Amino acid sequence: MGQLNVIEGHYDASGLRFAILASRFNDFVVDRLISGSIDCILRHGGTKENITIVRVAGAMELPLVCKKLSLTSKFDGIIILGAIIRGSTPHFDYVASEATKGVVNVSLQTDVPIGFGVLTTDTIEQAIERAGSKAGNKGSDATLAVLESIRVIQKIS
């Protein structure tokens, strides 16, 4: 039996250019996600000069601006960050679903790796837990995912 050919990415941000696209809504959570993402890039060899932060109003604005960023060819990867917290109306379900679908479509259309770090939680406490306390930092997790995807795609290409 022959040996398997395994292609894996590695967490090396050196020489890579990133856009961190983040919503302003629920900024007390999103700002922590941004900090986690920046810290992750720097810990893995990236530089501040290769990080561009773009802010938009809310989650519904993320897909279009993500597409525009993808089409510039200025970025090796884009990290999408936001926090959608359930309220008492079905608005949460529509926003969470459409924002997610929109960002996935951008990635498939433009071939730019996207790390999706948009929290969808039932409570503010759950969001805070996922932005750097008990449940880690999902901004950092999304950044690791995009780093790995970039390096896997480089090996495949």
UniProtKB/Swiss-Prot annotation:
Binding locations of 5-amino-6-(D-ribitylamino)uracil: F25, A59, M60, E61, A83, I84, I85, F116
Catalytic activity: (2S)-2-hydroxy-3-oxobutyl phosphate + 5-amino-6-(D-ribitylamino)uracil = 6,7-dimethyl-8-(1-D-ribityl)lumazine + phosphate + 2 H2O + H(+)
Keywords linked to the UniProt accession: Riboflavin biosynthesis, Transferase
Biological function: Catalyzes the formation of 6,7-dimethyl-8-ribityllumazine by condensation of 5-amino-6-(D-ribitylamino)uracil with 3,4-dihydroxy-2-butanone 4-phosphate. This is the penultimate step in the biosynthesis of riboflavin.
Molecular-function annotations in GO: 6,7-dimethyl-8-ribityllumazine synthase activity
Any GO BP annotation: riboflavin biosynthetic process
Keyword Cytoplasm carried by entry: no
Catalytic residues identified in the record: H91
Protein name: 6,7-dimethyl-8-ribityllumazine synthase
Organism domain of life: Bacteria
InterPro entries: LS, LS/RS, LS/RS_sf
Family statement drawn from the similarity comment of this UniProt entry: Belongs to the DMRL synthase family.
Pathway: Cofactor biosynthesis; riboflavin biosynthesis; riboflavin from 2-hydroxy-3-oxobutyl phosphate and 5-amino-6-(D-ribitylamino)uracil: step 1/2
Organism name: Lawsonia intracellularis (strain PHE/MN1-00)
Gene Ontology CC, one term: cytosol
Residues bound to (2S)-2-hydroxy-3-oxobutyl phosphate: S88, T89, R130
NCBIfam families: lumazine-synth (TIGR00114), PRK00061.1-4 (NF000812)
Pfam families: DMRL_synthase (PF00885)
